[in-house]
């Protein structure tokens, strides 16, 4: 690093806005939310989502409550084009959801973009071109007039093509890319020129998106930029001001919140902050920040763990354990004083009272989560902690979510005994909780065979003391097992590893089970010399623990399929 960074880096020039109003404002209603997980988020992945993962993400976004979703850059690839067509032709777009597509300012790309939208009832077409000085000079070699003319020509093309598709209600959106680094007066000039061509009205508004494509300043300066545009744009009553903050300086959430205070109506971002470089603004954090201030965000994260697992599986990116609201350690306290304060807070918290639990800005139950403290089990252990003792003493490496889950059982044990717990006691308790759980389903044995390219299982179990032989088929042993047992839960996560090495090696398998009637998720662990047997034992243990977490009505029908006369169940 340079001793004098001023020789290489310029400080950002503030906006002359001495009478700024945003610092005295508060946010009392949610902005319009626009998810760009399928476009900006997807293009930033090591391996972009395939069609199946894209569809899963789209349906998750709809379920959460997003009404505007940027789904593709149709002119960029045949894959994106085909996905838009599948959404339209497959009837996947709900009546209250509007899809958005992105296009650069070139006639052929615009034409291709509109072609992808044929037959859609309504859509947002998002036009952009870069306006910042370094892009004008280095990337495009254009003067200001050339950049403005490029945007105007593209705007005319969009208006002309849209007129030939009267069956679709189009909303036009324009972004001066790298707005955050563009001279503010020039950004206004280009935006005004585009909207003079589109001629939006208060009844049929256009969207002006003002992105911090690269976050270059403190959030207050971005807020000044937004307020200046809010005051000075022509046709303000016919425009929706949108912001698209990136997180290069780590302050995208603050920038978005201040931008709304400064006059923005709409925010573009991604779940959990996915996106180019350091990511787009995290829409989950923004929404739940509003929620903790008593404002309904209009997005439903009442099962945030499910949303998180979907996002991780679709993007192949892990969520940081300290990520606000959703990280595995967010509702975990290692400090004894923190644990004590939280425990006392829960003890006095009334169900209908205002939330006042120390160290916890939100009730984890509102997100479908629980408070679990990962306790320091033995001060003599050096590194301390349950996971450390199990790994060092018994070779069991706990996934983080299982570590948090098991810590509750250990906490109950230590509370009841009032004594320090030993590693041997932890191991015995672990086996009782997750490995030896044989009620109501007790594993007896199984056999596997392969026919017609599918795995077939013959599973012998005792269910509430009654011997049953169950048959199923699937794409692998676990798929076949789930079809055989026929319970209303699914394998949400599965992992396996060697427990010991050598001729007498044993394997440990961990299955995380979830279902509509199951509170949270339920873990099962299997340990056996045979890996497949270990995995079957893990799933059955997880099924037993899931059964314990459903209500009485769900319990009555939980094993209906298995208790009927067994016929082979084949997965599609």
From Swiss-Prot:
SUPFAM superfamilies: 2-isopropylmalate synthase LeuA, allosteric (dimerisation) domain, Aldolase, post-HMGL domain-like. GO terms for biological process: L-leucine biosynthetic process. SMART domains: LeuA_dimer (SM00917). InterPro entries: 2-isopropylmalate_synth_dimer, AIPM/Hcit_synth_CS, Aldolase_TIM, IPM_Synthase, LeuA-like_post-cat, LeuA_allosteric_dom_sf, LeuA_N_DRE-TIM, PYR_CT. Belongs to the alpha-IPM synthase/homocitrate synthase family. LeuA type 2 subfamily. NCBIfam families: leuA_yeast (TIGR00970), PRK03739.1 (NF002991). Residues 31-305 form the Pyruvate carboxyltransferase domain. GO terms for molecular function: 2-isopropylmalate synthase activity; acetyl-CoA C-acetyltransferase activity; magnesium ion binding. Catalyzes the condensation of the acetyl group of acetyl-CoA with 3-methyl-2-oxobutanoate (2-ketoisovalerate) to form 3-carboxy-3-hydroxy-4-methylpentanoate (2-isopropylmalate). PROSITE patterns: AIPM_HOMOCIT_SYNTH_1, AIPM_HOMOCIT_SYNTH_2, PYR_CT. Its EC number is 2.3.3.13. It is found in: Cytoplasm. Its cofactor is Mg(2+). Its main location: cytoplasm. GO terms for cellular component: cytoplasm. It catalyses: 3-methyl-2-oxobutanoate + acetyl-CoA + H2O = (2S)-2-isopropylmalate + CoA + H(+). Pathway: Amino-acid biosynthesis; L-leucine biosynthesis; L-leucine from 3-methyl-2-oxobutanoate: step 1/4. Residues 437-572 are annotated as: Regulatory domain. Homodimer. This is 2-isopropylmalate synthase. Mg(2+) binds at residues 40, 244, 246, 280. Keywords: Amino-acid biosynthesis, Branched-chain amino acid biosynthesis, Cytoplasm, Leucine biosynthesis, Magnesium, Metal-binding, Transferase.
């Amino acid at each position: 690093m340079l001793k004098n960074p001023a020789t290489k880096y310029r400080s950002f020039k503030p906006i002359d806005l001495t009478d700024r109003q945003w610092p005295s404002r508060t946010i009392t209603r949610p902005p319009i939310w626009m998810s760009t997980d399928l476009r900006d988020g997807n293009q930033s992945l090591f391996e972009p989502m395939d069609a199946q993962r894209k569809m899963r993400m789209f349906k998750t976004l709809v379920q959460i409550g997003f009404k505007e979703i940027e789904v593709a850059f149709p002119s960029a690839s045949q894959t994106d084009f085909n996905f838009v067509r599948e959404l339209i032709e497959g009837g996947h777009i709900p009546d209250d959801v509007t899809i958005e597509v992105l296009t650069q300012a070139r006639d052929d790309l615009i034409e291709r973009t509109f072609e992808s939208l044929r037959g859609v009832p309504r859509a947002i077409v998002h036009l952009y071109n870069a306006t910042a000085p370094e892009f004008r000079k280095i990337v495009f070699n254009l003067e200001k007039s050339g950049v403005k003319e490029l945007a105007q020509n593209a705007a005319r093309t969009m208006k002309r093509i849209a007129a030939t598709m009267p069956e679709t209600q189009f909303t036009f959106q324009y972004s001066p890319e790298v707005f955050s680094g563009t001279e503010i007066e020039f950004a206004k000039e280009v935006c005004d020129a585009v909207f003079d061509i589109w001629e939006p009205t208060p009844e049929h508004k256009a969207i002006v998106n003002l992105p911090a494509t690269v976050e270059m300043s403190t959030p207050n300066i971005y807020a000044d930029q937004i307020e200046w545009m809010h005051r000075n744009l022509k046709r303000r009553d016919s425009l929706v001001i949108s912001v698209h903050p990136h997180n290069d300086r780590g302050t995208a959430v603050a920038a978005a919140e201040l931008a709304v205070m400064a006059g923005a109506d709409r925010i573009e971002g991604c779940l959990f902050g996915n996106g180019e470089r350091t990511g787009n603004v995290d829409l989950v954090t923004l929404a739940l920040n509003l929620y903790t201030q008593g404002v309904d965000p209009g997005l439903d994260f009442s099962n945030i763990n499910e949303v998180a697992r979907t996002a991780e599986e679709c993007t192949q990116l892990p969520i940081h354990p300290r990520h606000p609201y959703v990280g595995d350690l967010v509702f975990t306290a290692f400090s004894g004083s923190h644990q004590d304060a939280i425990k006392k807070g829960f003890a006095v918290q009334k169900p209908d009272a205002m939330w006042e639990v120390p160290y916890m800005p939100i009730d984890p139950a509102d997100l479908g989560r629980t408070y679990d403290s990962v306790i320091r089990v033995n001060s003599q252990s050096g590194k301390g902690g349950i996971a450390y003792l199990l790994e060092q003493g018994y070779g069991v490496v706990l996934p983080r979510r299982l570590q948090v889950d098991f810590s509750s059982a250990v906490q109950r044990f230590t509370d009841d005994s009032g004594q320090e717990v030993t590693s041997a006691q932890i191991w015995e308790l672990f086996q009782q909780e997750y490995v030896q759980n044989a009620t109501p389903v007790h594993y007896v044995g199984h056999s596997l065979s392969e026919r017609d390219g599918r795995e077939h299982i013959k599973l012998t179990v005792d269910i509430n003391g009654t011997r049953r032989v169950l048959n199923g088929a699937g794409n692998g042993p676990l798929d076949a097992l789930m079809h055989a047992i026929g319970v209303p839960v699914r394998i949400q996560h599965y992992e396996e590893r060697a427990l010991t090495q050598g001729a007498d090696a044993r394997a440990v398998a961990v299955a995380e089970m979830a279902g509509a009637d199951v509170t949270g998720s339920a873990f099962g662990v299997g340990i056996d010399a045979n890996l497949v047997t270990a995995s079957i034992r893990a799933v059955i243990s997880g099924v037993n623990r899931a059964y314990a977490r459903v209500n009485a009505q769900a319990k009555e029908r939980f094993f209906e399929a298995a208790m009927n006369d067994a016929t082979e169940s084949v997965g599609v």
